[in-house]
Each structure stands twice: as structure tokens, then as C-alpha cells.
From Swiss-Prot:
Binding site for carbamoyl phosphate: R72, T73, R122, H152, Q155, G281, P282
Keyword Cytoplasm attributed: no
Name of this chain's protein: Aspartate carbamoyltransferase catalytic subunit
HAMAP family named among the record's database cross-references: Asp_carb_tr
Keywords of the record: Pyrimidine biosynthesis, Transferase
Organism: Hahella chejuensis (strain KCTC 2396)
Name of the top EC class for this enzyme: transferase
Family, as annotated: Belongs to the aspartate/ornithine carbamoyltransferase superfamily. ATCase family.
An annotated GO BP: 'de novo' UMP biosynthetic process
EC number of the protein: 2.1.3.2
Amino acid sequence: MPRIDDELSPLQLNRFQQLRHFLTIEGLSRKHLTDILDTADTFIEVGSRSIKKVPLLRGKTVANLFFEASTRTRTTFELAAKRLSADVLNINITTSATSKGESLSDMLRNLEAMAVDMFVVRHAQSGAPHFIAKSVTPRVSVINAGDGRHAHPTQAMLDMLTIRQHKHKFEGLKVAIVGDILHSRVARSQIQALNLLGAEEVRVIAPDTLLPPYIDQFGVKVFSSMKEGMRDVDVVIMLRLQKERMEGALLPSEQEFFRLYGLSQDKLALAKPDAIVMHPGPINRGVEIESAVADGPQSVILNQVTNGIAVRMAVMSMAMSGQIAELTADEEVA
């Protein structure tokens, strides 16, 4: 695994071992993850209220800094912050001063001068949220909304919440992650979370060209065949082919990929009868999954989207609580 995580682990916790930033799954305890899931559970019903608000971040300002395109992640972070009663800034990177040559550090300093309390960051460069978390003052928390190939911890946690809702526990579960493992920050975070939460077996199914060279360090079983890898699994997680990150001819064609690794009803029949089907989105129908499966009775893909709001509410509220606890302790010492 990339060693960015060695520095991230202590950085994201305060002196009381509470979340201060949320940058990666690596280095957190099972209790940290279950606390996030349990907190998210309490926020799910907020979405069904006539007034979808709780006051936990009232008076706080959250800035969404998305240096990569996003629909679901950016929108659910915005909804999460607003449902927590925060003020939200959506920074348009293409029209911001960074497009005129302003450095990221200067941009952050200016936003801090405006008393922004939290940055939600998506960046193409692995480790960018880590750099930002190290750079900001103690009055700012940083949430990683996906960095390069490195990590996407909130996506992993909304996936864990979805699995727990449908399977009730992680012990005894066999989970298959299928597709572009090489370029997927989602897969890395999912694998870390599943292993930490006690899944019996995590499988990855992919052609050799879409596996990272250090896959043996992930704590997974590797399969090159759907016929073998799908057998008797409880959960199937399909991944998007990340063509924007691919260099060279890693695939003969999308049609050939679907024939070998796309999830059809025939391939899904190899899994357990009550297996659930997941996908982090966006879906490429007919490439990694066929419509009959994506829209079928075993699909929980839209459930994942709904859970994304609750999980991001949980992470943001917990990080803010960790920030406040640290600041309060510092003031008492002073």
C-alpha cells in the first residue's frame, strides 16, 4: 500500500483519539469505524423529515474544494453540511484564483482568513488532503473526498453502512470487488474497512493488467475469473473502468471486458441467492454491469447514494466535535 498512510494515521486523530480530520481508513480502529456507522444510523431519519435539518454545525462554514469532477460526492457533501445547518461554500476551481496562478497554499490561507471551519477536498494528486491537513490551523478540519488512486474513505464508509443494513454484521461475509482495482481509490478504502470490520473474506476479481503490483499486501484473495471469484459471495461490488487514469492499452476493448468481467444475471447467479449488488458510481451500463442487474431486485446502488448523506453528516459532525474538543483542551491549558 502507498505509505502516505503512515503519516495520515496520527494526523487525523486528536489527543483523545477522536476524529479531527478524516483522511484515510488506515490507522483507525474498528471502534472508530463502528462509531461512524452508528452515528450515521442516527442521521438516516433526518432525510425523511419535513424539515431536513439538525443544528450540529450551525454557525460553522464548510468549503467544498473539488479539483476533480464529481456529482454524487460533491452533492451529498453539500446536502450533508446543509442538513447539519452549516453554511456551505462551493468553490468553482476553474474560475477561482488558482486558475490565475494562485498556489493551493495561498488559496487555503485566504479561505482560513474568512473563518472557514472545514475543507472537503477532492484532488487528482494522492496525498493532497494530507498536505492540506498539515497546513491548516487547529481551527480547521479536513475531509478527504477522494485523492488520486490513494483513498476515498467516506465512500468506503457509506458502502459499509449499506452492507451492515442488509447483512447486519460483517463476520462471515464473503465480498467480491470486481473491475479496475489498479486505479481505484474506492477499492483500497473498501478493502481496508472490510478487513478492519471483520469480513471473512475479501476477494478481488480483475485481469492482471488492472491489478496493482502490490496486491499481495492488501489482505485479499485474487481471482482472474468471474466463474471462480463470484462463487458463494454475499456482496458484489462493481467498479467503474477509470479510463481517464489509464495509460496504454490495458484492455482489448470494453466489449471484451464486459464479456469477461461485466456483471450479468448469469454471473450474478454464481453468488449466494441473497447477495447484494453495489457500485460506487458513476455506472457505465453494458461495460461493468448490465441494466437488468443494476436495476434488479438485488441492487442496492441507490441505497448507497442515500446512505452517503448520512455517513458524510456523521463524519463532518464527528470531525468538528474532535476539533472543538482539542481547541477546548488547549484553551484550558493556556
